[in-house]
Amino acid sequence: MKRICSIYRSPKRNEMYLYVLKSDVLKRVPPELLVAFGKPVHAFDLVLSPERALSREDINVVLENLDSQGYHLQMPPAEDDYIEHLPEELLRRNDPM
């Protein structure tokens, strides 16, 4: 079950991506989602299959969402994930003495 997918990034939120079937373009994405997402910026096209690994998403969930609803929305990582990667010095900077 291979799918050719177009991936768009959101101009409103860093690291938010919208996966759609290339043949459908954005036709099946609800208008309300497009308003919240912002004007989609094409990032790249990708062939998806169950054997392919994605860095932050479960490939089976992405493929299921593409088949059932016509799109998959990848949310940005939680802000806590960003904080964990900061140096200890920055994490402690505002702590009371």
UniProtKB/Swiss-Prot annotation:
Residues 3-87 form the YcgL domain. SUPFAM superfamilies: YcgL-like. Disulfide bonds: none annotated. It holds the Pfam family YcgL. InterPro entries: YcgL-like_sf (IPR038068), YcgL_dom (IPR027354). It comes from the Bacteria. This is YcgL domain-containing protein PSPPH_1548. It comes from Pseudomonas savastanoi pv. phaseolicola (strain 1448A / Race 6).
